[in-house]
Amino acid sequence: MGNTDNLGSWEQIRRGVVEVEHLISQKQFNASMVKSLEVLDLMVRTLAEKACIIDTDLMTMIDQLYQNHWISKPTCEHYHRIRTIGTKALNEGASNAYDASQAHQLLSQEVYTFANEF
């Protein structure tokens, strides 16, 4: 059952990245940043479950994954940057090409790491 769940999560993550790319190409920068946050949230919750980390807020789970050596320091920093960009888009309506592109670039890099290591 765990394998099926992981495959389902992986497929959602993969589709989420494709959607982020599509939103950026349509110049829907706010929506792309929010979607990046959603994909990050799914990745972090998937890892947290594997690491037996209690489901709390995203920031805390990222920190706990790093402290428990599930993710590297650069990955932790990337996760927090994506989280910050996405949260700003969600709460403040931020919508700019630079942040959307940065979130997408970091997310793509970390999805690649996620796919190869987990």
Positions of the model-derived regions?
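Hydrophobic alpha-helical packing segments in soluble, helical-rich domains
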Residues: N30-I54
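Short, charged amphipathic alpha-helical segments flanked by flexible coils
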Residues: A48-H80
